[in-house]
Amino acid sequence: MSETTGARERRPRTDAQRNRTHILDVAEQHFAEHGVTGSLDAIAKRAGVGPGTLYRHFPNREVLLAALLKAREDELVSRRDAIRREVDDPTEALDRWLDALGRWATAFDGLPEPLRAAPAEGTSPLALTCQGCITTTDEFLQAAQRDGGARPEVRGADLFLGVLAVSWARGAAMADESSPPALNTLLRTGWASRAVEPSER
């Protein structure tokens, strides 16, 4: 293969990666402003590409959301590892993990709904993301259960759904600044077998 031919073959891949990265940047801004139900065609227009280019990279909204959340996974993983490293009390560790999960689930307005629906849709790229979060929640939960700090019948999947419900309620029209701590307390008293003081944030 000649150098000229090689350069021609590399250029489309480079351009495609550049387009993909640019679309993700624009989509993050658009969803931050309009929520996850924002128009994909509007994202394409704002990115200066045709709808076909966007859909070649991201065939549907779930694929686009999964790509955006993938970019945030490093932060969530870092918080998980810090909790494991710094917190000795398994019940407090679970509490802090649920708080980190709640912050992740509120990255964009309306995000809890597609996350809630994803596990039931086996083909959704968000399903794998959710399963990873549930698996980690189970690990923290089981440690708290062994320590007597969480009720034995509670499941990680239920806590994950509870976090999504609280995250959704935070954005409800009737919610105010007192809603997040009140809702977190309600979730906490649902799983805790003894009183747990809210973690210092």
Language-model segments: what does each one mean?
Residues F58, L65-R72:
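Alpha-helical DNA-contacting segments of helix-turn-helix folds
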